Amino acid sequence: MSDMNKILQKWGASLRKGTDFDSWGQLVEAIDEYQILARQLQKEAQSPANSSDFTEDQKKTIGKIATCLELRSAALQYTQSQEGFTLEDVKKLEPILSSILTFNKEFPFDVQPVPLRRILAPGEEENLEVEEEEEDGGAGAGSPDLFPARVPGTLLPRLPSEPGMTLLTIKIEKIGLKDAGQCIDPYITVSVKDLNGIDLTPVQDTPMAVRKEDTYVHFNVEIEIQKHVEKLTKGAAIFFEFKHYKPKKRFTSTKCFAFMEMDEIRSGQIVIELYKKPTDFKRKRLQLLTKKPLYLHLLQTLLKD
């Protein structure tokens, strides 16, 4: 079996796994599977011609499938809506993905691949960003209409309750930044890491900010932490990475990050400090972003059955 056929077989198995979870009503698992596959497909769709065995037309179709998976994930997150991308729609993607090498029909959905924004490994962007303060200062000068909106965030629904277990909901209210108004397509990536920087839960992206004013970017969005508080390992932390699009470089960059440790989990409002990138998941070399009183503003809600 060729390498390409092995890749297609792997993608097909992942898609079927996602639709199985979807049909069984296991929404958290379905969203997670769809998101994992979508990222794999996006990475292939964005790969340079000299490092991919797929043609440009095939990569465009792969990118469209990734967009459809993002749309289904978004539909599952907002289950009260009767509209959006359906499970039956996703199932129509299976024969397209399996026959991508010979597929020559019109794509059944009016979608476009996620915009070609670079996917960078952690820390890679640091080698590309020179004179950042100067560059960021002009980043907001152009019309935001020039830059396509991101696919909706990858927020996951609340976990089922368990006797004696505590669920944590964190509302991201706003973040304080001196150049808040210049950030393009800002969003926050939320992850839960152990002391070694290993993920303890699925990573979630918020939708884009709802508004920007003065020195604040407002989100007003709730994140459901995907593990009961009692099951989080000692030394774990919840990370918040603020990201925005850099049009001159054509990639999405982490501007700063914040984190909350286990002893800070309690009901009510909390403000936490912002740190300079790159994101230090092991929390060993932390540098404050600014001496100004600018923070990430959160509201925590604990729910115990």
UniProtKB/Swiss-Prot annotation:
Organism of origin: Xenopus laevis
UniProt similarity note: Belongs to the AIDA family.
InterPro entries reported in the protein's UniProt record: Aida_C, AIDA_N, AIDA_N_sf, C2_domain_sf
Known role: Acts as a ventralizing factor during embryogenesis. Inhibits axin-mediated JNK activation by binding axin and disrupting axin homodimerization. This in turn antagonizes a Wnt/beta-catenin-independent dorsalization pathway activated by axin/JNK-signaling.
Region annotated Disordered, chain positions: 126-146
One GO cellular component term: membrane
GO biological process assignments: determination of ventral identity; dorsal/ventral pattern formation; negative regulation of JNK cascade; negative regulation of protein-containing complex assembly
All copies of domain C2 Aida-type, residue ranges: 156-303
GO molecular function: phosphatidylinositol binding
This protein's UniProt keywords: Developmental protein
Pfam families registered for this protein in UniProt: Aida_C2, Aida_N
Residue segments, region Axin-binding: 153-220
Protein's UniProt name: Axin interactor, dorsalization-associated protein B
Biased composition (Acidic residues): 126-137
Bilayer-crossing regions: none
